[in-house]
Amino acid sequence: MIRKAFVMQVNADAHEEYQRRHNPIWPELEAVLKSHGAHHYAIYLDVERNLLFATVEIESEARWNAVASTDICQRWWKHMRDVMPANPDNSPVSAELKEVFWLA
């Protein structure tokens, strides 16, 4: 498995709405993530800085990247763009993090 971590932001006035929309996520989105090899996907909120920290284990970069081109992912991004900064294609503004330590 490949471990990934990344950060995103959520609008200061949208913490509760962001959490509500993820509780639960759309079943179709969950199915696409799983079918594309995503496991142990978690998102954490830093309330004071409006930061979202996400971790996920993936089976391959190619399969993970393919999620973005699915219709359900495109609809999810559009659904979420009003609660977080988004790129012109509606994907969330994010930055990948470099792993510096792992204790198995």
From Swiss-Prot:
<dbReference type="InterPro" id="IPR013448">
    <property type="entry name" value="L-rhamnose_mutarotase"/>
</dbReference>
<comment type="subunit">
    <text>Homodimer.</text>
</comment>
<dbReference type="InterPro" id="IPR011008">
    <property type="entry name" value="Dimeric_a/b-barrel"/>
</dbReference>
<feature type="active site" description="Proton donor">
    <location>
        <position position="22"/>
    </location>
</feature>
<dbReference type="GO" id="GO:0019301">
    <property type="term" value="P:rhamnose catabolic process"/>
</dbReference>
<dbReference type="GO" id="GO:0005737">
    <property type="term" value="C:cytoplasm"/>
</dbReference>
<dbReference type="GO" id="GO:0062192">
    <property type="term" value="F:L-rhamnose mutarotase activity"/>
</dbReference>
<keyword id="KW-0684">Rhamnose metabolism</keyword>
<feature type="binding site">
    <location>
        <begin position="76"/>
        <end position="77"/>
    </location>
    <ligand>
        <name>substrate</name>
    </ligand>
</feature>
<protein>
    <recommendedName>
        <fullName>L-rhamnose mutarotase</fullName>
        <ecNumber>5.1.3.32</ecNumber>
    </recommendedName>
</protein>
<comment type="pathway">
    <text>Carbohydrate metabolism; L-rhamnose metabolism.</text>
</comment>
<feature type="binding site">
    <location>
        <position position="18"/>
    </location>
    <ligand>
        <name>substrate</name>
    </ligand>
</feature>
<keyword id="KW-0413">Isomerase</keyword>
<feature type="binding site">
    <location>
        <position position="41"/>
    </location>
    <ligand>
        <name>substrate</name>
    </ligand>
</feature>
<comment type="function">
    <text>Involved in the anomeric conversion of L-rhamnose.</text>
</comment>
<dbReference type="InterPro" id="IPR008000">
    <property type="entry name" value="Rham/fucose_mutarotase"/>
</dbReference>
<comment type="similarity">
    <text>Belongs to the rhamnose mutarotase family.</text>
</comment>
<keyword id="KW-0963">Cytoplasm</keyword>
<keyword id="KW-0119">Carbohydrate metabolism</keyword>
<dbReference type="Pfam" id="PF05336">
    <property type="entry name" value="rhaM"/>
</dbReference>
